Amino acid sequence: PVLKVEIPKPDGGIRQLGIPTVMDRMIQQAIVQVMSPICEPHFSDTSYGFRPNRSCEKAIMKLLEYLNDGYEWIVDIDLEKFFDTVPQDRLMSLVHNIIEDGDTESLIRKYLHSGVIINGQRYKTLVGTPQGGNLSPL
């Protein structure tokens, strides 16, 4: 299971993170290193957060390029509690369609179902994905 901790957000809200064990973090990093190059072509070209070879500066440069091309509107979407409500079966279906590797899929599913520890008590996780581990950005 991951240790659930609450981090204050600048707007006064709370961001809940799931902190994995050191061993889980190492295994997750190995998964990320293998999966990132496979998954990268499937991501939106306009997505810049937590992506290799992308940065705030590159996002701003792309924005300026759009402005120079005549675009006038920007849409900024922040879905509240998005990661807490991701349907795990749908996520795993997408993972399967991209990587088609049963062993890796099984590991990811185990992390999704590993549960959380809150105040020393363990709880099951049937929906959502933990934020705070190496797999989070992927």
List each language-model region with its residue ranges.
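Conserved pre-motif C helix in the palm subdomain of viral-like polymerases
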Residues: 14-43, 128-138
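Conserved polymerase palm-domain catalytic core
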Residues: 1-6, 10, 42-46, 50-54, ...
